[in-house]
């Protein structure tokens, strides 16, 4: 992220030093081009390790989220409005692993962008779109869990497939329209023309964002984050109260309807806990990056490049975390993975398989 040069003075040489090495150790991204960016390659050992770490994250994000989507969309037992939200969230994380992480990996390790100016803007737009899509999905998932835990018996009539579809459509449309409009209209660079000119070279993909839009980006993260934290605080208070009520009942015989309600409430609390962990993981992964973006915008390039790269990749790695969370907490997901990996999903009527323990 960049600072607004109309309000904060900046030194062109110091800015260029973030991307260009001194001439004494110069290596160019494109050796035969005069306006080539200068690269700072890692030695073979660290280079190999970084490719392995970043590549593993990308593969895990793609394969793990593909398993989540396949499980939910194939097995009829998983066809529920809440699970469709989870599948759509997995789609956003899948696309991060497919369209963002591999290209960021090369840029981070090589110090150069080899994929052209057109895809540079696409890459940045994809990055923003899928990140904001994820946080909007998680916000709606939080609301879904609150309704499910607070009143599990009427929940199916309130959070319907139609409501889920509207939540999914809103999450995708708003994030895509916002991110692509931001980078393709050039409003993010308003007031930073000299800075953009100084940073422009062949083999670079530097997107400058002025203070106003950095602040808006931060709010688009912060407001849903505060909503989610508030909702989950209420969820856990309700869950605690329900647990206390069940404990008071002890071994007394309850009516069948009450027993059924207790079982439903217990199931919904478990789902809320698992998805709450996914929400917490997302917030913890991306919060450092968004805080850093504010610091960089208002104090002016105080974050070292390597720190910025670490923060970005912590955020990217979140796209690979949700499948691991589901696999750890959900027996049905582990069973679905086994059926998919062994090819049993191709059998006739496999979509009717019972994934839940008796």
UniProtKB/Swiss-Prot annotation:
Residues 1-47, 105-125, 188-211, 296-309 are extracellular. It is a multi-pass membrane protein. GO terms for molecular function: trace-amine receptor activity. It comes from the Eukaryota. GO terms for cellular component: plasma membrane. It holds the Pfam family 7tm_1. Keywords: Cell membrane, Disulfide bond, G-protein coupled receptor, Glycoprotein, Membrane, Receptor, Transducer, Transmembrane, Transmembrane helix. Residues 69-83, 148-166, 233-274, 333-358 are cytoplasmic. InterPro entries: GPCR_Rhodpsn (IPR000276), GPCR_Rhodpsn_7TM (IPR017452), TAAR (IPR050569), TAAR_fam (IPR009132). Gene3D superfamilies: Rhodopsin 7-helix transmembrane proteins (1.20.1070.10). The chain crosses the membrane at residues 48-68, 84-104, 126-147, 167-187, 212-232, 275-295, 310-332. GO terms for biological process: G protein-coupled receptor signaling pathway. SUPFAM superfamilies: Family A G protein-coupled receptor-like. Disulfide bonds join 37-201, 120-205. Glycans are attached at residues 34, 210. It is found in: Cell membrane. In addition to the well known disulfide bond common to G-protein coupled receptor 1 family, trace amine-associated receptors (TAARs) contain an unique disulfide bond (Cys-37-Cys-201) connecting the N-terminus to the extracellular Loop 2 (ECL2), which is required for agonist-induced receptor activation. Belongs to the G-protein coupled receptor 1 family. Olfactory receptor specific for N,N-dimethylalkylamines trace amines, such as N,N-dimethylcyclohexylamine. Trace amine compounds are enriched in animal body fluids and act on trace amine-associated receptors (TAARs) to elicit both intraspecific and interspecific innate behaviors. Ligand-binding causes a conformation change that triggers signaling via G(s)-class of G alpha proteins (GNAL or GNAS). This is Trace amine-associated receptor 7b. It comes from Rattus norvegicus (Rat). The gene is Taar7b.
């Amino acid at each position: 992220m960049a600072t607004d040069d109309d309000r904060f003075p900046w030194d062109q040489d110091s800015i260029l030093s973030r991307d260009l090495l001194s001439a004494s150790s110069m290596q160019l991204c494109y050796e035969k081009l005069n306006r080539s960016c200068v690269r700072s390659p890692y030695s073979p050992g660290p280079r190999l390790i970084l490719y392995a770490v970043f590549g593993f994250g990308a593969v895990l994000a793609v394969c793990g989220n593909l398993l989540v989507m396949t499980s939910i969309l194939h097995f009829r037992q998983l066809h529920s409005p809440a699970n469709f939200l989870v599948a759509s969230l997995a789609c956003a994380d899948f696309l991060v692993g497919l369209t963002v992480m591999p290209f960021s990996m090369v840029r981070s390790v090589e110090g150069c962008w080899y994929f052209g100016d057109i895809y540079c803007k696409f890459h940045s737009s994809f990055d923003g779109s899928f990140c904001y899509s994820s946080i909007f999905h998680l916000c709606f998932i939080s609301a879904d869990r609150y309704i499910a835990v607070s009143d599990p018996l009427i929940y199916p009539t309130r959070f319907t497939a139609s409501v889920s579809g509207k939540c999914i459509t809103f999450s995708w449309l708003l994030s895509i329209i916002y991110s692509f409009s931001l980078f393709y209209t050039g409003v993010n660079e308003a007031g930073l023309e000299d800075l953009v000119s100084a940073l422009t070279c062949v083999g670079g993909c530097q997107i400058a964002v002025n203070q106003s839009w950095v602040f808006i980006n931060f709010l688009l993260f912060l407001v849903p984050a505060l909503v989610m934290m508030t909702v989950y605080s209420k969820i856990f208070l309700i869950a605690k109260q329900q647990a206390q009520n069940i404990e008071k009942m002890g071994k007394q015989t309850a009516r069948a309807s009450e027993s059924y309600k207790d079982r439903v409430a217990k199931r919904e609390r478990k789902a809320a806990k698992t998805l709450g962990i996914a929400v917490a993981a997302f917030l913890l992964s991306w919060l450092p990056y968004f805080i850093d973006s504010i610091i960089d915008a208002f104090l002016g390039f105080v974050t070292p490049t390597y720190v910025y790269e670490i923060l970005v990749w912590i955020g990217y790695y979140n796209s690979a975390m949700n499948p691991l969370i589901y696999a750890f907490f959900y027996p049905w997901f582990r069973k679905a993975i086994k059926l998919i990996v062994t090819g049993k999903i191709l059998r006739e009527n496999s979509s009717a398989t019972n994934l839940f323990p008796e």
